[in-house]
Amino acid sequence: MDEKTKKAEEMALSLARAVAGGDEQAAIKYATWLAEQRVPLRVQVKPEVSPTQDIRLCVSVEDAYMHTVTIWLTVRPDMTVASLKDMVFLDYGFPPSLQQWVVGQRLARDQETLHSHGIRRNGDGAYLYLLSARNTSLNPQELQRQRQLRMLEDLGFKDLTLQSRGPLEPVLPKPRTNQEPGQPDAAPESPPVGWQCPGCTFINKPTRPGCEMCCRARPETYQIPASYQPDEEERARLAGEEEALRQYQQRKQQQQEGNYLQHVQLEQRSLVLNTEPTECPVCYSVLAPGEAVVLRECLHTFCRECLQGTIRNSQEAEVACPFIDSTYSCPGKLLEREIRALLSPEDYQRFLDLGVSIAENRSTLSYHCKTPDCRGWCFFEDDVNEFTCPVCTRVNCLLCKAIHEHMNCREYQDDLALRAQNDVAARQTTEMLKVMLQQGEAMHCPQCRIVVQKKDGCDWIRCTVCHTEICWVTKGPRWGPGGPGDTSGGCRCRVNGIPCHPSCQNCH
């Protein structure tokens, strides 16, 4: 489009605005110019020249990287494109010089209205393309000046220049008085102090951590000038940021102290109770807050009765969590203080006695007092030959594994051999056990060497003395030295899907 055609369109639009506004002198002026230029026009009366009701405009926004998003703007059909650019700038921070609007499949100019492009009802669409700002230098003063010029154009003042009061005569430049020949007129304007946003190129103040327009972070390589002095606005902002940081640190400290006190109070309790309604996975009872116990190690929740029954029926010193389903068996253990809080004093003492008995039976260096019904026992070493029971005070011989007071070891063993020849019942029992061992109906425990027998069922048995799990078909321990689940030793049944023996009947 050449300059003459562009000027004619601007004069035609100015004529339309002057007629719509009732400005006769301006209308005569614009009509006279158009007539002198012999510009062909088409005049059409519109029933609604300047509608003022608000409508919803659907805008598709695209940037230089082909990123697209749809937004909705509340506008009026009589708004100019310049006013629309200002609205987007105020709402989203994109300067007007970076906005390129396409309405009705053609580029829209600033002085044109939305109504002239067919934007008249809700749902009408427009397209906004955001230009790259890398080659543009923007600052607050320039943005404010451009906005004021667009507001003046909307009011009908175009190409406005300020004239001084007085006669319209050219003012001659003042002669130089105290200036040497060759001296420059004025120092060049210093560049604005601050950092340029890499996204929208807005010049921000040095102390600002993010762009005031698009909130992009300040470049890491930027250094605040050492001689820079913040103005009053910056000092107020910095003081506000310091106060907000101080309040944040104070609230964080208070929250940490509160959490610490809460953990201390919780740690001082023997049992952790539930805070929400739950269901016991064992008996399926619905439990209100405070009625169930949450295990500390695995966080599973049960009623007190089910946990008490689990502890009483446990054959191990460490009580396992009773949670189990079709795919998972919890390996967690109940803590000692949880067990003590759940049981009565009598039941807790029995539980401790069970643990002591298990520890005694599983040790190869333990010895139990031979006095009938005496509970005394000890761990012995190789250089110790006698054990004085602290319960019955009898002296046990660790070499003979018996009590033979007033006799030495040789005298006791000779007497024992003599009595064995005359004891028919003892001899018959010994012969029967030998036959059972030879025929495979019994075996020695691989841990404590007592004779154990399988009555029926699968090939898994447990020693009644040391509680060692035994594989009957291999005549050895079921698990490795690590206990249940350790397949580094034992019979290693079902490892890689292979049974431990061709005759295995499931030693689980």
Swiss-Prot record:
Residues 231-259 form a coiled coil. InterPro entries: BRcat_RBR_HOIL1 (IPR047558), HOIL1_RBR_mRING-HC-C3HC3D (IPR047559), LUBAC_E3_Ligases (IPR051628), Rcat_RBR_HOIL1 (IPR047557), TRIAD_supradom (IPR044066), Ubiquitin-like_dom (IPR000626), Ubiquitin-like_domsf (IPR029071), Znf-RING_euk (IPR027370). Gene3D superfamilies: 1.20.120.1750, Phosphatidylinositol 3-kinase Catalytic Subunit, Chain A, domain 1 (3.10.20.90), Zinc/RING finger domain, C3HC4 (zinc finger) (3.30.40.10), Zn-finger domain of Sec23/24 (2.30.30.380). Residues 276-504 are annotated as: TRIAD supradomain. The keyword Phosphoprotein applies. Its EC number is 2.3.2.31. Keywords: Acetylation, Coiled coil, Metal-binding, Phosphoprotein, Repeat, Transferase, Ubl conjugation, Ubl conjugation pathway, Zinc, Zinc-finger. GO terms for molecular function: identical protein binding; ubiquitin binding; ubiquitin ligase activator activity; ubiquitin-protein transferase activity; zinc ion binding. This is RanBP-type and C3HC4-type zinc finger-containing protein 1. Belongs to the RBR family. Residues 69-131 are annotated as: Interaction with RNF31. Zn(2+) 3 binds at residues 369, 374, 389, 392. Zn(2+) 5 binds at residues 445, 448, 463, 466. A zinc finger (RING-type) spans 280-330, 445-474. Disruption phenotype: Impaired TNF-alpha-mediated NF-kappa-B activation and enhanced JNK-mediated apoptosis. E3 ubiquitin-protein ligase, which accepts ubiquitin from specific E2 ubiquitin-conjugating enzymes, such as UBE2L3/UBCM4, and then transfers it to substrates. Functions as an E3 ligase for oxidized IREB2 and both heme and oxygen are necessary for IREB2 ubiquitination. Promotes ubiquitination of TAB2 and IRF3 and their degradation by the proteasome. Component of the LUBAC complex which conjugates linear ('Met-1'-linked) polyubiquitin chains to substrates and plays a key role in NF-kappa-B activation and regulation of inflammation. Zn(2+) 4 binds at residues 397, 400, 404, 409. Auto-ubiquitinated. Auto-ubiquitination leads to degradation by the proteasome.
